[in-house]
Amino acid sequence: MLYIQYNAQKNNKTKTSRVYKPFPKIKKAMNLGRVIFYGSIRAFNQNAYRRLREHFISLEKEYVISGLSEEVIIYKDNRGIPHIEASNLNDVYKAQGFITTKDRLWQMDMSRRLVNGRLSEILGPDLINNDKLFRSFSLFRSAQKSICLYSEETLEWMQSYCDGVNTYIEHAKKLNRLPVEFTILDYEPEPWSILDMLSIGRLLSYSLSHNFTNEIFRFELQKKIDDELFEEIKPNYPSDGPITIPDYMMGENVKIQQQTSEKTINNLDFFSDHLAELLNLSSEVTKGSNGWVISGKHTKSGKPILANDPHIEMQAPSTWYQTHLKVNNETENMNVIGVTLPGVCGIILGHNDKIAWGVTNNRADVQDLFIEKRNPSNPNQFQYKGKWEEAEVIEEVIKVKGQADVAFPVVVTRHGPIISDVIGNNQQIKLKENLALQWNANYPTCDLEALLDINRSKNWEEFRNSLRKYSTPVLNFLFASEDGTIAYRVGGKIPIRNKGNGLLPVPGCDDEFEWKGFIPFEELPEVVNPKQGFIVSANNKVIGDHYPYMIASSWDAPYRAKRINQMLRKSIAENTPLVIEDVKIMQDDTLNLQAVQLLNILLPVLYPVKHNKLETECIRILQKWDCKDTSYNAAPLIYHFWWWEICCTLFKEKMGTFLFEKMVDRMNITDELIRKAAQGNDSTWFNNAGGFEKVIIESFKKSIITIIDLQGNNPYEWKWGEFHHFITKHPFGKKNKFIGNLINPQGKIPIGGSYVTVALASYDRKTGHILDGAPWRMVVDLKDCLGMDINAPGQSGNFLSHWYDDQSLLYVNQQLETQKFKPEQYRNSKMKVKLKPSKSM
């Protein structure tokens, strides 16, 4: 039974307050007014804002909570990071749930509603198609099937976290302290459950896996262009691109599995001409990451250093929530710090007092689209091996704010749910064909148990064994330990296909393209203590072509991985022992290796041509450029606009605007075409656009005209950061500019980097807004587990809090803060909260 008592301590007396709850409409208006009033104060008078905000930010120092066995103390440091000290794991997870909810409740609820397909319930009919899509994905159903795989002990910990969440929700309801977003949208949060926790954990799988849209892109493109053009733009990883585990590390050569796609393409001639509309879900922005680990033989401390900066959407509040969990008793011991997803217990990425770990997106192809043949006499039957099989039909009802409920059937074949009717841009796309999505995220898994085991692992063997339980999303795990071990391992379930390479949709009426299992755990790529003394992973190709299984057909452009390797090899060659500050500087590196390579090809094409004065000045700026994508420089602006114009000139007319915007592997393909054309190799794409020289010259001239429209006609006043910028955007601010300016007063902040630099910052090509980056960065020296990190824009989801965006400027200025891992670093905090067990237990 839920029990909570609130003690307001004033003059050492306990005071019970009567809570006033206004009528809903009045309360909604009051809170909207609060947003405007305090947002205005924040925008114009920061000091007054800081004083007044305390009226609406809870400052309780003590709570009495049922279910705790001992007192728990939470210390909040100067960045609002909770350091939770408890006597057992159940108590520490309950406290984690409580304090996380205090900071991120509305974000947690929105994540839950997204994955469960329940956004229309509070946001109205515009989100119906989005809800249909996620109901079809059925991630919450696979999460539900996963619960039985978890141990009783882990389920108990997870329930403790949920109890902590629900305790705070009830407390906030009683004192009318729910986040203001709930009042404005006129609803209250429901209790949190283990199913909610596991469901939103699968949002990472969704965020990191979009191969099914890539399959549709390739097939639609293959129908629009001839075979010669199509062959030129098949996925291709550069021959000089770095590989995380090259052949020389494997110590052996094995025969690679042969997979072709010719029959697949020939069997798809009946496919609909309207499939391009399915790509509305896709995005140019792809989620990546940087990670590397350095042996102690190359560090000043003599212990390994690990660096990690996962790339994900830049949003407010941050995707990540920083937390420190400390438990110390005779039977249970844990001291772990890092980040997690709000609503999920434990630490997903970080370090304890013995090991550190990080991840990057593996890019494994874990999704396939199957073209299912429906029985014309029975719409719930599909052909398989000459017979009609009954599909599972789940009748869904979507509640919609302001209108009647919407009934919606989810049809699930042997390969997965039919998704072809619901993929679109806020509209239902009806197709003759039936596409079923097979995805490793639709299988029952116990990923969170693996991560909770990692939190308490003390060495490589324990860490590796924990990964046996891990399935999705497929990640590259980087590891370092106090004993000097450094390692890399692929974690997750990667399918083994009977046939095909995952590039295109395949017929589902027989077993020709079936999955026949997953790559065995012992055969997943792994390297421990390599002779070179470091390991780098930056979404580049994972392993050489002698590996017997197909992991993926396409990888990120190799520039980030190549640059990290370059910096590490230089330090080692100079015999310079690395310290944590050196590695932080590497994370902040803005050298554009793409420009280093391509300008040697592109600039000479311009020299024989007559240019106007402004164009000539732009060429001089590029000639003098050090190829660093710094925010204050004009050269990055000229270069990136020029490169983009080359892409547009090559592909847009032939592909059409829609397909061009959804183009897969655009960077690798474009750069390879430029390199080959410069070497004299014939390119049909360049020939169709007027020839290599014409494309390069005209693209340059067009890009200069575009920049003039943006920043005037003096190139020496142009700045990359005037276009390329970071901005903290609360979801409410995206819809209403006035409210957005009040909630996010810092406005646009110039930032360096780009989509090819180690300091990654991919952006909207129309607005320059940063879309994808590394909101959380970490560097850890295993000597005394000294860690530094940053989490932009901040810890709190409350836009009235100082911690809402206090890390934004640190992030833009490429600064990290020292983690307060030792008790003496955080126990003197003035922000101390005690959670006391109820006497009525």
Regions inferred by a protein language model and the residue ranges of each:
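Substrate-recognition/specificity elements adjacent to catalytic centers across diverse enzyme folds
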Residues: L2-N7, N11-I305, P310-E313, N328, ...
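Terminal end segments
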Residues: A29, F37-S40, F44, M550-T616, ...
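Gly/Pro-rich active-site capping loops and adjacent beta-alpha segments
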Residues: P82, D91-L133, L139, G358-P409, ...
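Second-shell loop/turn segments in exported
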Residues: V92-A95, A143-L155, Q438, L448-I454, ...
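Stable alpha-helical elements in mature extracytoplasmic
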Residues: V115, L139, A143, T154-W157, ...
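Glycine- and hydrophobic-rich flexible loops that cap the catalytic core of alpha/beta enzyme folds
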Residues: F270, E284-T286, N290, L325-G346, ...
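Hydrophobic alpha-helical segments
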Residues: S420, G424, E433, Y470-E574, ...
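Charged, long alpha-helical assembly modules
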Residues: Y639-F723
